[in-house]
């Protein structure tokens, strides 16, 4: 296999004075490239300028025998950066859009200035540089572009509405460039790296930063920039030696008859089906897809029109009575239909349009509804728009950001004015109106935002670089607002409509006209504006009677544990990096994604035996060490009642809260508490680890078995702890730690526990100490069908304060400052509390169990709502998941209970 090289290739790297950009520059130069090292040299927040950063990198390249030139221009002056390349080297072949700054702030505090500054550097700078290089790419029939996105761009991130917007916009930009560049051999891709840089050093703990060197990211960038790369329009997640493609997955969705029976009520009735990715019983046209373009709406609407009228029997009531809704761009087209529908469901509608909106208002009033006109331009009059709403109705409940313009043009011919004007309406306008409505939502603890994107934003589209990037930016913005709004009951969702309007008329074929009416989109929007909408941060595609959900799907990927990963590793493992046939994941948050990546990176089954240098005699020496006495835990009915109440028991369930009840009992997960009431628990396995730091421990799974039924409600329990297995995972260790708890007087075995911990930055021997029960090792994958049972479990804002009294006093769960130090916006709920809440919900439905196993896959904040989904897999086994309704994440997965009785009560 011939090595990848960049001989005679000219590479521009923006933001190359440090971090990722610096490392890229050095590596490109080593492989023969002529490098333009661009860096303004400013501070991380974008202030100032200093040429030294770029000069230092160039000096190092030249010292090592490479060729490079420094460039000190702002990325907004992209033509000057390209001019530097052309003057020195004659052309440009590769652009790495890497420059970036941070201006983090919550939605409540973020200013338009902070928002636009980040958009300018990340997105508009990428546009300026790429636009200036495009003619050279076209002329030489060769170009490579790598846009630097981020996990925040994929999933949103608290306090980063600006950054997430820009980073997701770069995805849509890359997709459109890929489509337009195809005939010129111009390949455009995007990466979402988690790497050590000036930016991440300020937000990640040092132990994690050690794993996130730029040397782990560069090999992928080098490959995507090479002549050998044939991939284009693709996205990749990369961190710590993990490389995987991530792509869009679209659910088969639901077809509705597109007639008068298509209402918000029938959408509400079948809403869970829209989100269901089990397509095993669906026809071919409703199978899940992994698309690069909009759906086959011609087939979908044709099939939808064959259906009988929609059945609304049993559908929930949908009402927006007295809700105040602002709909932008509602003077005509989609917005007008939305306004009429919201009014029909009882809302007070403020009809915004930069033209006269009175016609829509008059139609609403004529139909018996209430409406008020607003004639302002969302691009520049956002404050006046919100003021008009408040002056008229005193508040705002729902915001539909619908206003839009098109300025379609091929990228080669697109002007900066055409780029800016589309961005100002779609992206800046959406941010500003959301920002200004936010305080009213927070004050009343209710808000609904529906942001209108486009399939051009999700998949890119020829001739729409401006539109697709802005609409893609709305995705990251919306997901961030959904995360931030969760604690205040502010829900934000995204809709990509396919409908015929005056603005979109030119893109429809003649035979498609009059098939995709705007009123076929409105039923979904009405439901998304209601009190009862169960999701936030979700993306929907809709048109012609079809509604589907769109999410990320990530390949299993490839992992390199080499200290110096080369571009050849990417080349040799490209099939694995882009393989979606097995072990795919659907991450929905930066936490979920990074935890899965961390776990994957740990999975090095090929560690050399020679790394294990412990003397065999150490084991014997350990046995001679003085041992702590096995702890004895004394508990009574007070401890039992306190624990039961923390898991939701009430006075309507006396068996849990009244010690004199004839059926007084404890929820079985009580049996894990001994591990938090004994110092020996951790001490007993710490001696097996080298360089162990308890701050780097993650509780990954927990298995518990009740051996004596029913479990006692008072007594003395003596517990012995023992390791079950230690498994090195690269520079990390997975340890399975066991305990057995017996009655201190009779010696009868009461409980056994197995806790699986993932511990970073330590070493251990690869050793199995004891066998494990089959139930503990079963993966318990959730079936690809609708659950047999589901129930929502509200989590009190104060639950962590109560639950910690049972033993787990970790300040992470109560102290805001400690939580911030751990990079959480506020204290998180105990994982074992989520475990117990789920267990009680299952007991209430199915009856008691004596075995439970679960994997922790996400965090829960007090005040959120859990949704426990359960599947009956056999007479005595119930598989379950626990979701966080507010953020659309999964907190517990790969979980099951084994019932005490013979059969499940279902």
UniProtKB/Swiss-Prot annotation:
Reactions catalysed, as given in the entry: a (3R)-3-hydroxyacyl-CoA = a (2E)-enoyl-CoA + H2O; a (3R)-3-hydroxyacyl-CoA + NAD(+) = a 3-oxoacyl-CoA + NADH + H(+)
Main location: other
Gene Ontology MF, one: isomerase activity
Domain MaoC-like: from-to ranges: 782-893
Region span, Short-chain dehydrogenase like 1: 5-228
Induction: By growth on N-alkanes or fatty acids.
E.C. designation(s): 4.2.1.119, 1.1.1.n12
Binding of (3R)-3-hydroxydecanoyl-CoA, residues: 699-700, 729, 757, 808, 810, 831, 856-858
Any single GO BP term: fatty acid beta-oxidation
Motif Microbody targeting signal per UniProt: ranges: 904-906
Residues that, per the record, bind NADP(+): 13, 52, 98, 131, 163, 167
Region (Disordered): 600-633
Compartment annotation: Peroxisome
Region (Short-chain dehydrogenase like 2): 319-532
Annotated metabolic or biological route of this protein: Lipid metabolism; fatty acid beta-oxidation
Keyword Isomerase assigned: yes
Biological function: Second trifunctional enzyme acting on the beta-oxidation pathway for fatty acids, possessing hydratase-dehydrogenase-epimerase activities. Converts trans-2-enoyl-CoA via D-3-hydroxyacyl-CoA to 3-ketoacyl-CoA.
Domain-level remarks: Contains two SDR domains.
Subunit structure: Monomer.
Protein name, UniProt field: Peroxisomal hydratase-dehydrogenase-epimerase
Organism encoding this protein: Candida tropicalis (Yeast)
């Amino acid at each position: 296999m011939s090595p990848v090289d960049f001989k005679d290739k000219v590479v521009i790297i923006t933001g190359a004075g440090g971090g990722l950009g610096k490392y890229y520059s050095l590596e490109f130069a080593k492989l023969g490239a002529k490098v333009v090292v661009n860096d303004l040299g400013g501070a991380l927040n974008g202030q100032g300028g200093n040429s030294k950063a770029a000069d230092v990198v160039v000096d190092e390249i030249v010292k090592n025998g490479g060729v490079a030139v420094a460039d000190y221009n702002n990325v907004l002056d992209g033509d000057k950066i390209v001019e530097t390349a052309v003057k020195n080297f004659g052309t440009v072949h590769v652009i790495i859009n890497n420059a970036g700054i941070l201006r983090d702030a919550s939605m409540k505090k973020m200013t338009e200035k902070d928002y636009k500054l980040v958009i300018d550097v990340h997105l508009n700078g990428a546009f300026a540089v790429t636009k200036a290089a495009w003619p050279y790419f076209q002329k030489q029939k060769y170009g490579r572009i790598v846009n630097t996105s981020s996990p925040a761009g994929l999933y949103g991130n608290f306090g980063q509405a600006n950054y997430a917007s820009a980073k997701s916009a770069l995805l849509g930009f890359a997709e459109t460039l890929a489509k337009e560049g195809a005939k010129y051999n111009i390949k455009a891709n995007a990466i979402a790296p988690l790497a050590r840089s000036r930016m991440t050093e300020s937000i990640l703990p040092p132990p994690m930063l050690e794993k996130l060197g730029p040397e782990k990211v560069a090999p992928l960038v080098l490959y995507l920039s090479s002549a050998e790369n044939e991939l284009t329009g693709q996205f990749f997640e990369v961190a710590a030696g993990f490389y995987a493609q991530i792509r869009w997955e679209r659910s088969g969705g639901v077809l509705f008859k597109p007639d008068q029976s298509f209402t918000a009520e029938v959408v509400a009735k079948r809403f869970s089906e829209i989100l269901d990715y089990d397509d095993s019983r669906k026809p071919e046209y409703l199978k899940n897809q992994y698309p690069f373009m909009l759906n086959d709406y011609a087939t979908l609407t044709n099939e939808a029109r064959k259906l009988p009228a929609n059945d609304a029997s049993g559908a929930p009531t949908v009402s927006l009575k007295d809700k105040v809704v602002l709909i932008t761009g509602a003077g005509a087209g989609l917005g007008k239909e939305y306004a009429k529908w919201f009014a029909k469901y009882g809302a007070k509608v403020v009809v915004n349009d930069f033209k006269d909106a009175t016609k829509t208002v008059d139609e609403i009033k004529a139909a018996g509804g209430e409406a008020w006109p607003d004639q302002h331009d969302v691009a520049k009059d956002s404050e006046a728009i919100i003021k008009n709403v408040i002056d008229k109705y005193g508040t705002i409940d729902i915001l539909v950001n619908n206003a839009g313009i098109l300025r379609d043009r091929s990228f080669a011919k697109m002007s900066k004015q055409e780029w800016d004007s589309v961005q100002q309406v779609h992206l800046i306008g959406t941010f500003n109106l959301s920002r200004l409505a936010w305080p009213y939502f927070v004050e009343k603890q209710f808000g609904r935002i529906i942001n209108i994107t486009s399939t051009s934003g999700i998949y890119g589209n020829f001739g729409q670089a401006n539109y697709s990037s802005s609409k893609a930016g709305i995705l990251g913005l919306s997901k961030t607002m959904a995360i931030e709004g969760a604690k205040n009951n502010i829900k934000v969702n995204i809709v990509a409509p396919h409908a015929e309007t005056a603005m979109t008329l030119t893109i429809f074929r003649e035979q498609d006209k009059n098939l995709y009416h705007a009123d076929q989109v409105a039923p979904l929007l009405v439901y998304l504006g209601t009190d009862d909408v169960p999701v936030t941060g979700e993306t929907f595609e809709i048109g012609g009677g079809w509604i589907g959900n769109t999410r990320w799907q990530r390949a299993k990927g490839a992992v390199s544990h080499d200290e110096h990963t080369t571009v050849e590793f990417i080349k040799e493992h490209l099939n694995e990096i882009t393989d979606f046939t097995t072990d795919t994941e659907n991450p929905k948050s930066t936490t979920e994604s990074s935890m899965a990546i961390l776990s994957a990176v740990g999975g090095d089954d090929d560690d050399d035996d020679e790394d294990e240098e412990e003397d065999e005699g150490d084991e014997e020496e350990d046995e001679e060490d003085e041992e702590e006495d096995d702890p004895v835990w004394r508990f009574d009915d007070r401890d039992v009642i306190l624990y039961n109440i923390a898991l939701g028991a009430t006075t309507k369930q006396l068996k849990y809260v009244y010690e004199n009840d004839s059926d007084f009992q404890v929820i079985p997960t009580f049996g894990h508490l001994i591990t938090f009431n004994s110092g020996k628990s951790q001490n007993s396995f710490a001696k097996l680890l080298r360089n162990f730091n308890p701050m780097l421990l993650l509780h990954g799974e927990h298995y518990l078995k009740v051996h004596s039924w029913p479990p006692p409600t008072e007594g003395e329990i003596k517990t012995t702890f023992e390791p079950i297995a230690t498994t090195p995972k690269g520079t990390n260790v997975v340890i399975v730690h066991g305990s057995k708890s017996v009655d201190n007087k009779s010696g009868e075995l009461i409980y056994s526990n197995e806790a699986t911990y993932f511990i970073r930055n330590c070493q251990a021997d690869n050793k199995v100490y004891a066998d494990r029960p089959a139930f503990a090792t079963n993966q318990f994958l959730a079936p690809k069908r609708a659950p047999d049972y589901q129930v929502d479990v509200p989590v009190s804002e104060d639950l962590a304060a109560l639950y910690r009294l049972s033993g787990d006093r970790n300040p992470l769960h109560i102290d805001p400052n400690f939580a911030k130090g751990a990079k959480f916006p506020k204290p998180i709920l105990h994982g074992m509390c989520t475990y117990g809440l789920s267990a009680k919900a299952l007991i209430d439905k199915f009856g008691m169990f004596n075995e439970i196993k679960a994997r922790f896959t996400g965090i829960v904040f007090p005040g959120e709502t859990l949704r426990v989904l359960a599947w009956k897999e056999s007479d005595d086994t119930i598989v379950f998941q626990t979701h966080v309704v507010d953020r659309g994440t999964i907190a517990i997965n790969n979980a099951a209970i084994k019932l005490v009785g013979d059969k499940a009560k279902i």
